[in-house]
């Protein structure tokens, strides 16, 4: 059975059996090698595409990212290592119903994070109830005593949150971590989508893919709601 590579990813020949380690969930195919429902159309497209042509377009994407400086740094070593953003021509497809369920769960999680922070900087009921050890908060470098009693606009402390998710099975997701202090990576997502649109426009004409280009507008609107507003001179 043939296998091919796009960047650092490895895929089984779409015409053959699946070679994904059984310990991991295969996003694209079921255990019988048939495509999962969200990937049915993409799988049909992939099987008729020319392998050399696909690899060439993958190289074009990497060349574009390198030329335009779309990279990220890996810190923690003696020197920062600049790398290209991961680009995969086999997309991770999430169906609309699945996305709606994830959205509700993520929104609930972010509300819980903000409620926790509001309690920590106000009544501290979660500490008095013994649910969270006091020392865990008091000795945490991220805890700011000067914020005690401060009420941010809308009671929102975490304005932008990056939730790292991993799928472990059909309709089963887990949160790896909540990036709530300095989340990053949105620009990579925007550039990735723009590159996919340029290299594979036919995929977007055949499938109803939700746009991501409106993210900057939504971000601006969200941040605008958090501004402190001072009374107008006419109101005084």
Give residue ranges: language-model regions:
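Conserved metal-phosphate-binding beta-hairpin within the catalytic cores
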Residues: 147-182
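Short N-terminal or domain-adjacent regulatory/targeting segments
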Residues: 195-227
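Conserved small/polar residues in nucleotide/adenosyl-binding loops
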Residues: 228-235
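Short acidic, Pro/Gly- and aromatic-enriched capping/linker segments at domain boundaries
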Residues: 14-30
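Low-complexity, highly charged intrinsically disordered N-terminal segments
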Residues: 57-143
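Extended active-site and interfacial segments that coordinate phosphate-rich ligands
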Residues: 174-207
């Amino acid at each position: 059975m043939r296998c091919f590579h796009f960047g650092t990813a490895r895929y089984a020949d779409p015409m053959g059996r699946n070679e994904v380690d059984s310990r991991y969930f295969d996003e694209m195919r079921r255990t019988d090698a048939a495509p999962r429902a969200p990937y049915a159309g993409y799988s049909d497209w992939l099987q008729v595409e020319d392998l050399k042509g696909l690899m060439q377009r993958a190289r074009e994407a990497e060349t574009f990212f390198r030329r335009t400086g779309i990279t990220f740094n890996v810190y923690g070593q003696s020197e920062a290592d600049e790398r290209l953003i991961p680009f995969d021509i086999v997309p991770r497809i999430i169906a609309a119903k699945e996305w709606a369920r994830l959205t509700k769960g993520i929104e609930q999680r972010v509300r819980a994070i903000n409620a926790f922070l509001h309690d920590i900087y106000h009544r501290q009921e979660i500490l008095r109830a013994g649910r969270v050890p006091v020392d865990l908060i008091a000795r945490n470098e991220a805890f700011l005593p000067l914020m005690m009693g401060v009420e941010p606009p809308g009671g929102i402390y975490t304005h932008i949150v990056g939730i790292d998710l991993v799928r472990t099975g059909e309709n089963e997701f887990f949160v790896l971590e909540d990036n709530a202090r300095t989340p990053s990576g949105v620009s990579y997502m925007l550039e990735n989508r723009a590159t996919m649109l340029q290299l594979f426009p036919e995929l977007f004409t055949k499938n109803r893919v939700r746009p991501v280009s409106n993210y900057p507008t939504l971000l601006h609107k969200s941040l605008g709601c958090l501004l402190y507003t001072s009374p107008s001179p006419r109101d005084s």
